[in-house]
Amino acid sequence: MEFVIGLLIVLLALFAAGYFFRKKIYAEIDRLESWKIEILNRSIVEEMSKIKHLKMTGQTEEFFEKWREEWDEIVTAHMPKVEELLYDAEENADKYRFKKANQVLVHIDDLLTAAESSIEKILREISDLVTSEEKSREEIEQVRERYSKSRKNLLAYSHLYGELYDSLEKDLDEIWSGIKQFEEETEGGNYITARKVLLEQDRNLERLQSYIDDVPKLLADCKQTVPGQIAKLKDGYGEMKEKGYKLEHIQLDKELENLSNQLKRAEHVLMTELDIDEASAILQLIDENIQSVYQQLEGEVEAGQSVLSKMPELIIAYDKLKEEKEHTKAETELVKESYRLTAGELGKQQAFEKRLDEIGKLLSSVKDKLDAEHVAYSLLVEEVASIEKQIEEVKKEHAEYRENLQALRKEELQARETLSNLKKTISETARLLKTSNIPGIPSHIQEMLENAHHHIQETVNQLNELPLNMEEAGAHLKQAEDIVNRASRESEELVEQVILIEKIIQFGNRFRSQNHILSEQLKEAERRFYAFDYDDSYEIAAAAVEKAAPGAVEKIKADISA
């Protein structure tokens, strides 16, 4: 039983597969059949009728016969073959020869594709032929008009073209021959060839028209404009030399020879080769070279104005610095009698004198070059600018040096004023310690006060010496100032601490009779207090009172601050 069921399942599967493949093949047959009908319905004959108004000779006749043969081949040979193969494919499918059926269908597809390509090619050639005829018919009149206009312009202005007239007229004759050839090809039905001929003449005419338009100007440039510019440049150069400008570095003779050779080259390529682009490029290069020379000449004029205007100013500035050098030198000697100058300060004066000598040499060198005939102003601009910069730098350095000299006296006065203030601070600090009735002054404060007195005295000694060494005096003064300020600050803190300790002990005395431990601690605090050990005294007293009455110390501090 199971065998029978299995067999039935296999048969059903085979039937289903056969049904599926046959259905797929039938669908492809229907598609190819529709394609075949579509090809047969294409309006090829109607499209071919579009050329009936053309002359049926030459290329037109050849194309028409070729198209008709190709269409007849498709209709009478390809399509019947396709029909026959479609029948074979259907028969193979009915007999379950699916592989054979598919091979036939592929062959049919190739035949229909080839037929489609042939039809598209025919339609494209028809369109090209008709379009060529239509465009040529429209454009030939424009070409004739442009030809006539070019011919008239050439004749009317023949004197402007010189030796090129015959060459241009020959080109026009060739274009006219091309127009005649176009007419002959059109008359012979060769519309494609005629189109190519017409386009070629259109390009030739456009090129020739540019020649006719551009050649007169280029010839005028070669024979009149540019030679005039060169002559003007030469005259301007000569005038500048007469005015005293040194222009040998420009090498104008060599440049003029180069310009003349380039001009001959431009005229040659224009007259013999009719190469407008090359001639224009050469003339453009000549113009750029001329402008470049003018820029050099203008630069020389500007350089001359700059050098000649600045040199007198620089000489005056230099002479003034020389005078100031002598004044500063004398001032330095005077200052040295009262003050001891550092090596760096003395070095600044020496450096100033050295740089001034160098500037003097540079100015002399430039003056010598100005007197020479071969040195151009443009070659001196940078040297003059460098001298100007150096003079400004020396002016600034010299002004700073003089300010430093003048500042020495100011520093001395400030130092003496600071000394007076420090002595006053020391006296006030000593009076504070004395009037505060403290048991004694801690050794470190006593040492600071003694050290401050020492540095103050050293500063006084330095200020009284001649020559005065302000650098060393300033160092002692700075040390004295630091020590005095620190001693004053710590003395004030000491007095405040002593008052606080006394208040804390006085507050703690309330509890002495009731608290033996507190009493002993306060005795120790008092002992330390009279031994000048105020820090430990405060710590012991504050700890004892705070233990007996928490918060009492802060309250005492607050009362004192109030």
From Swiss-Prot:
UniProt feature coiled coil, ranges: 377-425, 470-497
Keyword Cell membrane appears in the UniProt entry: yes
Subcellular location as annotated: Cell membrane; Membrane raft
Matching Pfam families: EzrA
Membrane topology, Cytoplasmic segments: 22-562
GO cellular component labels: membrane raft; plasma membrane; septin ring
UniProt-listed InterPro entries: EzrA (IPR010379)
Extracellular-side segments: 1-2
Highest taxon in the source lineage: Bacteria
Disulfide bond sites: none
Residue stretches spanning the membrane: 3-21
Biological process, per Gene Ontology: division septum assembly; positive regulation of cell division; septin ring assembly
Membrane topology listed for this record: Single-pass membrane protein
Disruption phenotype: Suppresses temperature-sensitive mutation in FtsZ, in a wild-type FtsZ background increases the number and alters the position of FtsZ rings. In minimal medium cells elongate and occasionally form minicells. Double dynA-ezrA mutants have longer cells with more double septa than either deletion alone. Mutant is hypersensitive to tetracycline.
Keywords recorded for this protein, A-Z: Cell cycle, Cell division, Cell membrane, Coiled coil, Membrane, Septation, Transmembrane, Transmembrane helix
UniProt PTM: May be degraded by FtsH protease.
NCBIfam families reported for this sequence: PRK04778.1-7 (NF003413)
Described purpose of this protein according to its UniProt entry: Negative regulator of FtsZ ring formation; modulates the frequency and position of FtsZ ring formation. Inhibits FtsZ ring formation at polar sites. Interacts either with FtsZ or with one of its binding partners to promote depolymerization.
Family affiliation: Belongs to the EzrA family.
Protein name stated in the entry: Septation ring formation regulator EzrA
Record gene name: ezrA
